[in-house]
């Protein structure tokens, strides 16, 4: 009933739920802002009311090719056209409750170390880190969280490699025994497999569509080399055999 924030449902997938885009969502919910967060977590589908609430216009999508205004569809890096306009994600009460649930599950499972392999995916890493730190360090669960910065966060915020290294060094200096950064950095090679956006070699997808490169090979190479030279352990998001081949070839050059 609260129309000041969107109603967000996670888990949508057309194989199970049918095709739903902006037109269908607007017809179902003409007044309530609604966002479907795809099962892959790499796609957002929104209705008219959500676009109006977030004050997103078609002009805002210039420079964001992985978007479809007519369909209200934002996927992979195209999601960064929406994410900065969604500060409610970091509402302390809402985010804190989610983190508390996570810490409780970690405790119940006997897990003592958990890694976040995409710190900054919501476009505001400092807010994210502060909320994680507040929840974890105020918890009695004997667990620690290791946070891993991700290439797409820095690129979406137009940071240089040098600025990224400086920022991560600052975060590392602020580490505690419960929430810490160490020398880890994550690359993003191809898109989500649940979204059919992974990169495959022949014969590829049977309908002929192609996957998505999250970051160009040339840019990925530069960032990987810089962080490798700085003594970082590299992690990579890769799904299809085409992207795995690119990653292996990249590692051979380091």
Where are the predicted features?
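Divalent metal-binding segments
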Residues: 1-166, 183, 187-243
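Short, conserved active-site loop motifs that form the nucleotide-linked donor/cofactor pocket
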Residues: 178-180
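Accessory "access/gating" subregions that flank catalytic or transport cores
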Residues: 171-176
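Conserved helix-loop functional segments at active or binding sites
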Residues: 226, 249-253
């Amino acid at each position: 009933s609260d129309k000041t924030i969107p109603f967000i449902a996670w888990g949508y997938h057309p194989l199970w739920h049918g095709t739903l885009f902006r037109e269908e969502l607007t017809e179902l919910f003409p007044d309530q802002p609604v966002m479907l967060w795809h099962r892959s977590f790499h796609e957002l589908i929104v209705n008219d009311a959500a676009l109006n609430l977030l004050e997103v216009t078609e002009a805002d999508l210039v420079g964001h090719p992985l978007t479809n205004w007519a369909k209200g569809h934002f996927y992979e890096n195209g999601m960064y056209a929406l994410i900065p306009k969604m500060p409610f994600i970091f509402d302390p009460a809402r985010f804190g409750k989610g983190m508390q649930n996570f810490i409780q599950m970690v405790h119940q499972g006997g897990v003592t170390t958990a890694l976040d392999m995409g710190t900054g995916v919501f476009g505001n890493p400092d807010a994210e880190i502060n909320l994680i730190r507040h929840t974890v360090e105020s918890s009695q669960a004997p667990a620690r969280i290791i946070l891993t910065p991700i290439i797409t966060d820095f690129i979406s915020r137009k940071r240089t490699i040098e600025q990224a290294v400086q920022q991560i060094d600052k975060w590392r200096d602020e580490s505690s025994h419960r929430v810490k950064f160490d020398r880890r950095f994550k690359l993003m090679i191809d898109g989500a497999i649940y979204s059919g956006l992974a990169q495959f070699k022949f014969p590829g997808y049977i309908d002929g569509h192609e996957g998505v490169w999250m970051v160009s090979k040339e840019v990925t190479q530069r960032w990987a080399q810089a962080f490798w030279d700085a003594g970082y352990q590299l992690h990579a998001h890769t799904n299809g055999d085409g992207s795995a081949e690119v990653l292996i070839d990249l590692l051979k050059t380091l």
